[in-house]
Regions:
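Bacterial N-terminal signal peptides that target proteins for export
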Residues: 1-9
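Beta-rich carbohydrate-recognition modules and glycan-binding surfaces
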Residues: 2, 19-185
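Bacterial N-terminal signal peptides
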Residues: 8-18
Length: 185
């Protein structure tokens, strides 16, 4: 009887480890099942800018991903292209950051978080990341996100996060960034 209990205990521990790891992270998006209904493309043209681009949803083998491409132009007070998703629910209260799997054209890109407190269109919390040519796991703690202005809190309130945007921003350049997964940790 004791060997059977030992085997049962090992089985429970083995099963419990993945369950614990899963409970500590929340997957937000894997770009499967009609992601075009959840994501939208936005450019500085909404304010007179000249940037152009698009978001495409692609797959390589069994891996679905989104690709943000375009030309970012700072002419005419512009300077961004973005793919944005409104969250179906806020992140878990104990989440400490955002996780992405990305690749790109060796350029710097940004995540913009909007919260209940970002009322004006130009308000957001921003953190940057580099997108190398190979798929890379990026972790951005919420403490790394900086407000776009003085009227916002210093860091976003986790339970108030309403949307996530992947953004090519702030300088003239050709953008291409692929995103395979987004989640909270």
């Amino acid at each position: 009887m004791r060997p059977l209990l030992k085997i049962a205990a090992i089985a429970l521990l083995t099963l419990g480890i993945p369950l614990t790891a899963t409970a500590q992270s929340t997957m937000l998006e894997t770009f499967e099942n009609t992601p075009e209904t959840r994501w939208r493309f936005i450019a500085d043209t909404v304010m007179g800018g000249l940037s152009r681009g698009q978001v495409s949803f692609l797959a390589e083998g069994s891996n679905a991903f989104a690709r943000l491409t375009g030309t970012v132009s700072t002419a005419n007070n512009g300077g961004f292209i973005q793919m944005r998703m409104d969250l179906p629910a806020p992140p878990p209260a104990d989440a400490t950051g955002l996780r992405l799997i990305v690749r790109g054209n060796d350029q710097r890109y940004f995540i913009h978080l909007r919260t209940a407190g970002t009322v004006l269109p130009w308000q957001y919390y921003q953190a940057g990341f580099d997108a190398p040519g190979e798929w890379t796991d990026i972790r951005l703690p919420f403490s790394a996100f900086k407000p776009s202005g003085r009227l916002l809190r210093n860091t976003p309130r986790t339970t108030g996060i309403k949307s996530v945007g992947i953004v090519a921003f702030g300088r003239d350049h050709q953008a291409q960034v692929d995103v395979r997964e987004i989640g909270f940790y």
